[in-house]
């Protein structure tokens, strides 16, 4: 016989009872008032807050748990439904049997990912990019900019570094003082990223810098021109940080979650910190592709619970041009 979930009232803000239930990132249902209710806002390592009157259940971060809330305890009346894993070769995201390998065929992976991106866009789905500064360092700014322009990016999540080096590249053609086009160092180039931070402060924001006409290219230029939202989360090592960077970690988490809401696919580009953070904020039903030159970065993402992620061991500067080309080819034939 099915047992209704057990729950108890929170006695103090942010404090859970000893036997609270901790969620996975898989779709979860609770048996409440003799019927199954789907838990909304599914994420791993969260509490489940229920409303027995409205018959609702939602994942909640510890910081959002308040006195008087009803929280699920124990394991009675809880059903977890892991997503099905298709047999090898049947699904675009089942490239090879291992999740992360340096020996996967990049060309075929790119082709399958491109087909998925075109399909999601056609169905008015949501594609989110999580990006690190290596996008700029490796010369892939123009490729990501084109993807934004073509409507294949519906939100960008990053840190201070991607913005600063993107603006440095737009202003001076360098990234960390290295001429991106020729791969050579430049005179006094070590100060270039600080020049970028200074220009951002001078303008007051990315939006104002774009409006001023000082930059006319780049990832965040395209975001502003194409109304693509972005959230930049600060860290202790940031230069600046730039005016648009959110330095309150809790607020940054909230804004990341807003962008990730209803995402169909998340592409993670060379940023271990932000990729793992995002992995913790999405359900296992969201497709994830992580591209990084370092195999251990992708392995860490998988080890921390984002088991649905497919790891592509590649330099983003090599992978993004191939992906963009594949998207253009597929778009022409449809």
Regions found by a protein language model. Name each.
Residues 127, 145-198, 268:
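Active-site histidine-anchored catalytic micro-motif
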Residues 1-93, 179, 184-193:
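Electropositive, gly/pro-rich neighborhoods at or near active sites that engage anionic ligands
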Residues 78, 132-138, 161-164, 238, ...:
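Gly/Ser/Thr-rich loops at beta-strand to alpha-helix junctions
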Residues 179-334:
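C-terminal functional extensions of proteins
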Residues 87-102, 197-202, 237-239:
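Gly-rich Lys/Arg/Thr-decorated short loops/hinges at beta-loop-alpha junctions or inter-strand turns
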Residues 42, 82-86, 139-143, 166-172, ...:
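Short acidic, glycine/serine/threonine-rich loops at helix termini
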Residues 117, 121-131, 135-149:
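Active-site pocket-lining segments that scaffold enzyme catalytic pockets across diverse folds
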Residues 105-122, 297-302, 320:
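Structured alpha-helical segments in the cores of large, soluble enzyme domains
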């Amino acid at each position: 016989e099915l047992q209704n979930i057990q729950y108890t009232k929170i006695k103090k803000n942010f404090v859970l009872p000893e036997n609270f239930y901790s969620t996975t990132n898989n779709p979860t249902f609770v048996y409440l008032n003799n019927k199954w209710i789907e838990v909304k806002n599914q994420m791993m390592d969260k509490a489940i807050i229920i409303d027995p009157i409205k018959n609702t259940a939602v994942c909640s971060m510890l910081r959002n748990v308040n006195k008087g809330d009803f929280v699920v305890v124990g394991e009675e009346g809880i059903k977890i439904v892991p997503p099905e894993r298709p047999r090898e070769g049947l699904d675009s995201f089942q490239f090879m049997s291992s999740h992360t390998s340096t020996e996967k065929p990049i060309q075929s992976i790119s082709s399958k990912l491109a087909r998925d991106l075109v399909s999601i866009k056609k169905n008015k789905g949501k594609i989110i990019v999580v990006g690190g500064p290596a996008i700029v360092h490796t010369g892939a700014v123009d490729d990501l900019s084109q993807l934004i322009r073509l409507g294949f990016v519906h939100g960008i999540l990053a840190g201070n570094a991607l913005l600063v080096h993107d603006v440095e590249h737009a202003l001076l053609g360098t990234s960390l003082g290295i001429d991106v086009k020729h791969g050579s160092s430049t005179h006094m180039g070590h100060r270039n990223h600080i020049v970028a931070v200074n220009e951002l402060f001078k303008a007051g924001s990315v939006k104002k810098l774009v409006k001023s006409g000082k930059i006319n290219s780049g990832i965040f230029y395209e975001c502003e021109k194409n109304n693509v939202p972005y959230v930049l989360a600060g860290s202790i090592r940031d230069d600046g940080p730039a005016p648009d960077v959110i330095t309150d970690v809790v607020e940054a988490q909230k804004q990341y979650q807003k962008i990730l809401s209803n995402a169909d696919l998340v592409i993670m580009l060379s940023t271990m910190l932000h990729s793992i953070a995002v992995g913790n904020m999405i359900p296992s039903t969201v497709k994830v592709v992580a591209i990084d030159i370092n195999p251990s970065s992708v392995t860490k993402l998988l080890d921390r619970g984002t088991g649905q992620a497919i790891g592509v061991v590649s330099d983003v500067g090599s992978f993004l041009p191939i992906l963009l080309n594949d998207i253009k080819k597929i778009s022409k034939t449809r």
